[in-house]
């Protein structure tokens, strides 16, 4: 699936089928956000105990019921592996999976920089496209920046990562 932004600020998705035929469709950005969040929230490959974890940090959001524990394994300044345990809403689970995809394999310094960019984005601080690119799919979480009830869900695991990477 290719995603391209057109002049009307809608996204144009180009679906390729197995027979190489292409079908184009215009969709609103909210539809793409919803589908991306659902896809990330359903992923399970990062949800497991992490043997040899060098850090563990629990995050709890009583307003939504999210209770997620982030586990990290660092070695020689590299984030070697990250996983999580617990349960949360679709937003917190998707956000956690995005975070793990983002920081796994990076140096601690690179991961800290991504966290800084993320928190600036969520606070509505202006940032360059280049800065935001380091967030990958996590950029869509900016959608929740102005939703007081959901921003806690979107940032929960990122706060845990911030503690673990200090």
Can you describe what each PLM-predicted range is?
Residues 43-86:
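Structured beta-strand/loop patches that form or line metal/cofactor-binding pockets in enzymes
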Residues 73, 84-143:
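Active-site- and interface-proximal helix/loop "cap" or "latch" segments in soluble metabolic
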Residues 64, 91, 146-150:
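Secondary-structure capping and boundary motifs in well-ordered enzyme cores
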């Amino acid at each position: 699936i290719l995603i391209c932004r057109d002049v009307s600020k809608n996204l144009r998705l180009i679906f390729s089928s197995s027979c190489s035929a292409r079908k184009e469709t215009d969709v609103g950005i909210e539809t793409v956000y919803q589908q991306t969040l659902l896809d990330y929230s359903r992923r399970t490959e990062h949800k497991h105990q992490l043997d040899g974890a060098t850090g563990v940090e629990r995050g709890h959001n009583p307003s939504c019921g999210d209770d997620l524990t982030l586990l990290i394994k660092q070695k020689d300044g590299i984030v070697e592996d990250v996983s999580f345990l617990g349960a949360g809403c679709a937003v917190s689970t998707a956000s956690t999976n995005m975070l793990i995809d983002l920081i796994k394999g990076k140096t601690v310094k690179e991961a800290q920089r991504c966290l800084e960019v993320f928190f600036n984005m969520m606070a509505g601080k202006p940032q360059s496209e280049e800065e935001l690119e380091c967030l990958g799919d996590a950029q869509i979480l900016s959608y929740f920046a102005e939703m007081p009830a959901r921003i806690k869900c979107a940032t929960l695991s990122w706060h845990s990562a911030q503690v673990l990477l200090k």
